[in-house]
């Protein structure tokens, strides 16, 4: 019942917004090129199809991973499933990583991306972002016994850092440890493996991943305490679909104000969120 009421409310607000845009919306919709017509079509297409195609990074628990049977799980999986449930459709997951998550969206392979992605101005040139549904900061992880405390300690040609392309961690390493050798891998799972094997000296990722992984390593890995960023983790959406973006913003806001986001965070991390999120609606 709550899902039906919520969905109905969102659709009403969406239609009111479109109708209030006046003559421009009417004249432009006849060309089939407006953001309003595209966004309504996007939402309706998903509902008519009966399937939400979501790109999710399944390489870094507890944000996203696979269990022993290969089934997806994690915070992003729960969020995507909740959104699909709200629309009354099934969830279809495409596994993406730092390099493929934006192309998957811009190519139309997926409708939406839940992939632990920081919203920033550079990425916003290619895609749209929702209001943040999580906040995190970049941290450094090293092996137990390492003398490296901060990123500047890694600025040496003898140092190797594991990073994934297109990530904030890569940007940080390039900016503050330019002399170090960057070892590029596909995902955070591979970053962790190389670090455990002693093939690299450090790696960088969101605190949500670093803290969880170090805590599960039985003392083998250590998360350094310094936070290098305070990043808005946002849902990725296609360009030109602003009413779809507005709909997703309302969904995220509802999840925050209802307490569902906090409960889901505590489910996966065992603690309350370290940063407060703001509901826009």
Report residues per predicted region:
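C-terminal motif of bacterial Sec signal peptides marking the signal peptidase cleavage site
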Residues: 15-19
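Ligand-binding clefts/hinges and TM-proximal coupling segments of bilobed small-molecule sensing domains
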Residues: 22-27, 35-37, 168-185, 222-224, ...
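Extended ligand-binding regions for polar small-molecule ligands
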Residues: 31-36, 77-86, 145, 152, ...
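Extracytoplasmic small-molecule ligand-binding "clamshell" domains
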Residues: 32-116
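Short helix-initiation/N-cap motifs at beta->coil->alpha
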Residues: 92-103, 148-149, 165-168, 183-197, ...
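A ligand-binding cleft/hinge motif common to bilobed small-molecule-binding domains
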Residues: 100-103, 117-125, 172-175, 196-230
